[in-house]
Amino acid sequence: SSEAQVPVLRVPRGQGIIGAAIESGDIIFVPNVHADERHFKDAEPITGITTTSLIAVPLITQAVQLGQELGSAQPQIIGGLEAINRVDGYFTTEDADLLQTLAKQAATVFQIAKLYGDANELFLDTIQAMVASIDAKDPYTNGHSQRVSEFSVAIGKQMKLSPEIIHQLRIGALLHDIGKIGIPDTILSKPGHLTEDEINTMKQHPAIGANIMQNVRLLRNEIPALAEHHEHIDGTGYPNHLTGDQISLFGSIVAVSDVFDALTSDRPYRAALDVEEVLNKMQKDSGSHFDDACVQALIKAYLAGEIKTQKDRAA
């Protein structure tokens, strides 16, 4: 029936007739599997299906590695496809042609999935490298971007955001301070309070970050996290003095995560504040500086053990 489930069967690498097809790269016809010593006999008790005959073909695709020169793709066997128990007689060359066609389509799908995974991993690694370069410029906030990203994800989960949105939020939060790459090192690494001019220079980093990333099409949904994480509900934030609903959800979430991490982390001019004190302060500022729903989600995430401060991690 349409609801029938096929048991999961794992054949050890190199075993079975399908293993022989994968290792050799050849199409294998077997009219009587029980007369073939390569037959994987443990399959039938698991599947409940008695195999009499079969045909096995390798899944062959072009191995493409990101970062390699064009033209470097080489044929690669990534698996195998097997058909069993032809109803009327033995398997034919026509059956082999059909199975090879199906195998090529399956191999293409698998290869696309792998390339997507590789590209996504490369993309995330590149972002991590960019963030690490910012942390290297500002030693007093080492690990800040990673923590803000993790806090933002925890808030997003408490707010029941979809996995796709949370993935975008994770990246946007990770990149929220990327604009500091345009701020002089003398300001970033200054061990003490900044002058008014230095503060005004530092306030440019959200706009700098948004400008850097605005032409990266893959990041267009994440840019509000970069541009708006210092905006306040009452319009007293920067750089654009946005108010209320003018501030995006990403901007609101990252604003809460950013301040929570800043206040619960050590700085050269003060020690980390107590978490309870910080949460009370942020609750008082809800509706003026912070979006109340985001603050409540932060509190729930912290009480659920989903958020670890800098001090927690060092313990």
Residue map of PLM features:
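Regulatory loop-to-helix N-cap segments in sensory/regulatory domains
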Residues: 40-41, 61-80, 84-102, 194-195, ...
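Heptad-repeat alpha-helical coiled-coil signal-transmission segments
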Residues: 106, 112, 119, 123-126
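Metal-dependent catalytic cores of enzymes that make or break cyclic nucleotides
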Residues: 4-8, 25, 48, 65-72, ...
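Interdomain signal-transducing alpha-helices
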Residues: 21, 25, 54, 83, ...
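Short amphipathic alpha-helical signal-transduction/dimerization elements
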Residues: 22, 34, 88, 100-111, ...
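Signal-transducing coupling segments at domain and membrane junctions
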Residues: 2-9, 14, 31-57, 61-73, ...
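Soluble sensory domains of the PAS superfamily and closely related sensory modules
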Residues: 20-28, 34-37
